[in-house]
């Protein structure tokens, strides 16, 4: 049996979109994101060189379905290329005996913030004091765990108290935030996503991190709004994921999703939080920041923290007591 390695070089702001495209067609939704690094001369630590392009990879079984999947990926890249610089799709054939190591070589241990360390599950890592280690398997867009929107969330999470809290991770993706909350001391985490692949990935990553009794991953959304607000075009049909309605239930809500979704869910965030509860939001492009700020101000959420990285903004808000 043979495999096809598909790769494309993009700028940092296109990584998440290309990763989501590759996850739709790649084997088991697996995506590898290879960022340029600046190694340290004195330690195994390194920094990401954000000024250099990023390589995004996925893999296909070389069977009769591969040609159609490759065509769909090429079409998707063409559309994305209308908005951001996207390189040509590169395709390489890999023999079965080389497959096991071909995809693993593009993953490495990565420190985010002061405490979080993301470690591919097959690598060994000796944690330092106060490290919070997240062992993750590649699944739906694993590489987006390194995306600025996720980094901002993890950094903001380090600033609040999680011991004995009840947490909602909305749009859980790979489950990195849900598992992070559990590792920081949360007693119960509900992880919701409208994509069943994301729900499976979150459940698996919770298991790998021995957090399966703390993290519950379900397919669904939050509140009363129509579910089409989750996608980037109007009138999209998402099938029938359940819409969950919670009142004064969560100490913390984590939501790394589209800015337009944050705008729609302002009232639902407020309703779901306990008095004094904390909302961390990311996935907000600079151009949509004012919309999100206005929506949250309108419902009475109090801004506590604002952070930026590149073109992205993240917030911490609090529900009044």
From Swiss-Prot:
> Top enzyme class of this protein?
transferase
Q: Which UniProt keywords apply?
A: Cytoplasm, Methyltransferase, S-adenosyl-L-methionine, Transferase
**Name of the protein:** Ribosomal protein L11 methyltransferase
GO cellular component entries? cytoplasm
The cellular location(s) given in this protein's UniProt record come to: Cytoplasm
According to its UniProt entry, what is the function of this protein?
A: Methylates ribosomal protein L11.
Q: Name the GO terms of the biological process aspect.
A: methylation
UniProt-listed Enzyme Commission number(s): 2.1.1.-
Kindly give the Pfam families that the UniProt entry links to this protein: PrmA (PF06325)
Q: For this UniProt entry, what is the primary localization, expressed as one broad class? A: cytoplasm
- What does the similarity note say? Belongs to the methyltransferase superfamily. PrmA family.
Do the record's keywords include DNA repair?
no
């Amino acid at each position: 049996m043979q495999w096809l390695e598909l790769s494309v070089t993009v700028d940092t702001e296109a990584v998440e979109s290309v990763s989501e495209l590759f996850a739709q067609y790649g084997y088991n939704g697996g995506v590898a994101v290879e960022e340029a690094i600046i190694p340290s001369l004195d330690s195994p630590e390194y920094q990401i060189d954000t000024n250099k392009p990023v390589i995004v990879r996925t893999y296909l079984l070389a069977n009769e379905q591969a040609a159609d999947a490759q065509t769909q990926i090429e079409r998707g890249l063409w559309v994305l290329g209308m908005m951001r610089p996207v390189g040509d799709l590169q395709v390489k054939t890999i023999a079965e005996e080389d497959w096991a190591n071909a995809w693993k070589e593009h993953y490495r241990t990565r420190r985010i913030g002061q405490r979080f360390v993301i470690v591919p599950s097959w690598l060994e890592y000796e944690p330092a004091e106060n490290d919070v280690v997240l062992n993750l398997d590649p699944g739906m867009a694993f590489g987006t765990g390194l995306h600025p929107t996720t980094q901002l969330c993890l950094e903001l999470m380090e600033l609040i108290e999680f011991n004995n809290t009840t947490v909602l991770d909305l749009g859980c993706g790979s489950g990195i935030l849900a598992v992070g909350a559990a590792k920081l001391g949360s007693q119960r985490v509900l992880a919701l996503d409208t994509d069943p692949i994301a729900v499976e990935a979150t459940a698996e990553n919770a298991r790998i991190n021995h957090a399966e009794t703390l993290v519950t991953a379900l397919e669904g959304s939050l509140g009363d709004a129509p579910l089409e607000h989750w996608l980037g075009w109007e009138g999209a049909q998402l099938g029938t994921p359940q819409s969950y309605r919670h009142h004064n239930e969560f100490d913390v809500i984590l939501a790394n999703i589209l800015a337009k979704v944050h705008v729609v869910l302002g009232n639902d965030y407020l309703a779901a939080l306990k008095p004094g509860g904390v909302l961390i939001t990311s996935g907000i492009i600079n151009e949509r920041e004012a919309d999100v700020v206005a929506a949250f101000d309108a419902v009475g959420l109090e801004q506590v923290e604002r952070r930026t990285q590149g073109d992205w903004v993240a917030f911490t808000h609090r529900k009044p007591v």
